[in-house]
């Protein structure tokens, strides 16, 4: 036992008062460290950190910080991205790899850069083309973006999205895919 008391709540929608209400509840219960694990909580956490200067706020995957009680952290997801890029570079026949990506934020860009470096490590002739969807979860937009890349000749589709749509489009076209954030084992 560590002597540290923890509590959590799941499935809190982004962009609603719910997140702030849960945080205030935790603070009233005496919690002095708050960790938010969704990119969409970033602005709310920034405001809450200002409101509660004696509470430490850590935002997973964000890029904002105030230097006192609000910071961010994220795992080294670029490392497996690099490795998956090596596999994609070895797997492509067309030398065009498509990448369906949500938003041009540091987390996503780090992943794309690492993936591309991995591709080039095993196939210096390959190119990675990125399509931005401007959404974390919209299966129609993600699928259409993957299809556009497939139509250009991509035979491997990678993604940084929250649905399986891009991978499903790749599978339907007989292409390979590199998943992220969604269980794609049914399509392997």
What are the roles of these predicted feature ranges?
Residues 1-188:
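A residue-level marker of the well-folded mature domains of exported/periplasmic proteins
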């Amino acid at each position: 036992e560590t002597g540290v008391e923890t509590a959590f709540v799941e499935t809190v929608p982004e962009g609603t008062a719910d997140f702030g209400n849960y945080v205030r509840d935790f603070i009233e219960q005496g919690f002095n460290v708050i960790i938010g694990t969704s990119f969409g909580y970033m602005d709310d956490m920034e405001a809450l950190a200002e409101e509660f200067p004696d509470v430490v706020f850590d935002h997973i995957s964000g890029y904002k910080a105030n230097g006192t009680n609000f910071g961010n952290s994220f795992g080294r997801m670029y490392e497996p991205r690099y490795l998956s890029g090596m596999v994609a570079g070895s797997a492509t026949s067309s030398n065009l790899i498509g990448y369906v990506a949500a938003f041009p934020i540091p987390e996503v860009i780090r992943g794309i850069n690492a993936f591309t470096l991995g591709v080039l490590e095993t196939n210096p002739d390959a190119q990675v083309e990125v399509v931005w969807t401007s959404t974390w979860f919209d299966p129609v937009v993600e699928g259409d973006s993957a299809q556009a890349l497939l139509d250009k000749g991509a035979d491997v589709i990678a993604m940084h999205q929250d649905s399986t749509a891009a991978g499903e489009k790749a599978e339907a076209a007989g292409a390979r895919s590199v998943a992220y954030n969604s269980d794609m084992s049914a399509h392997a």
